[in-house]
């Protein structure tokens, strides 16, 4: 047996092990790079991140009117309610409601009282995502429906002056987004 054969015979397993580990390491690096690219592309784009939070000037919203803005691709109703609307919302017995949850991202797990659905203690400002919770249609407002609030013409859901479902197929109240007053005339959504 030649010296080369002896040397190969002594270290054959070591060379084989090295090639095995080198190939496995290269495969792991390649798989990690592919996984990183796949996960990274799922992050929101810059334009989506820019829309994640918006500021809305409500200085021109008169009592009894509403402003609709687009946020995250959905309409958001910002209503400045009248004293009659506030009183009508506060007189409702929770036992009459289909959905007894406030559906308020600012107050999770709160009951659907009028106070838990408005932005201020006086109940003047009501901010809701303007999407019917039945099949995603946009309800009409300004006193529409049988309860003086909003009405979804697609399938007949009626919402009261607090945006709570009162009649129809919608299973939940209109949802309230994360929102806060930055000052007396600016609301931040998101």
Swiss-Prot record:
Binding-site residues for [2Fe-2S] cluster, renumbered to this chain: 132, 134, 152, 155
Cofactor: [2Fe-2S] cluster
Domain Rieske: 95-188
First-listed, main subcellular location of the protein, grouped into a coarse class: membrane
Enzyme class: translocase
Subcellular location, record wording: Cell membrane
SS bonds (residue pairs): 137-154
Gene3D superfamilies: Rieske [2Fe-2S] iron-sulphur domain (2.102.10.10), Single helix bin (1.20.5.510)
Co-factor binding details: Binds 1 [2Fe-2S] cluster per subunit.
Membrane topology of the entry: Single-pass membrane protein
Reactions catalysed according to its record: a quinol + 2 Fe(III)-[cytochrome c](out) = a quinone + 2 Fe(II)-[cytochrome c](out) + 2 H(+)(out)
Pfam families: Rieske (PF00355), UCR_Fe-S_N (PF10399)
PROSITE patterns cross-referenced by the UniProt entry: RIESKE, TAT
EC numbers, comma separated: 7.1.1.8
Source taxon at top rank: Bacteria
GO molecular function ontology, one term from the record: 2 iron, 2 sulfur cluster binding
Transmembrane portions of the chain: 18-39
Extra facts: The Rieske protein is a high potential 2Fe-2S protein.
Family to which this protein belongs: Belongs to the Rieske iron-sulfur protein family.
Function text: Component of the ubiquinol-cytochrome c reductase complex (complex III or cytochrome b-c1 complex), which is a respiratory chain that generates an electrochemical potential coupled to ATP synthesis.
Complex formation: The main subunits of complex b-c1 are: cytochrome b, cytochrome c1 and the Rieske protein.
Descriptive protein name: Ubiquinol-cytochrome c reductase iron-sulfur subunit
Species whose genome carries this gene: Paracoccus denitrificans
Chain's gene name: petA
């Amino acid at each position: 047996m030649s010296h080369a054969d002896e040397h190969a015979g002594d270290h054959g397993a070591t060379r084989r092990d090295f090639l095995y580990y080198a190939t496995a390491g290269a495969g792991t690096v390649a798989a990690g790079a592919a996984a990183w690219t796949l996960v990274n592309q799922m992050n929101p784009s810059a334009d989506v991140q820019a829309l994640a939070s918006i500021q809305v000037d409500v200085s021109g919203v008169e009592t009894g009117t509403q402003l609709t803005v687009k946020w995250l691709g959905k309409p958001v109703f910002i209503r400045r309610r009248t004293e009659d609307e506030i009183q009508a919302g506060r007189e409702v017995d929770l036992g009459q409601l289909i959905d007894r949850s406030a559906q308020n991202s600012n107050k999770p797990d709160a009951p659907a009282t009028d106070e838990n659905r408005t932005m201020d203690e006086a109940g003047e400002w009501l901010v809701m995502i303007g999407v019917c919770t039945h099949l995603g249609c946009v309800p009409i407002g300004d006193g529409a429906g049988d309860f003086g609030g909003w009405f979804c013409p697609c399938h007949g859901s009626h919402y009261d002056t607090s945006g709570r479902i009162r009649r129809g197929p919608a299973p939940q109240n209109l949802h309230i987004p994360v929102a806060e007053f930055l000052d007396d005339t600016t609301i931040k959504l998101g």
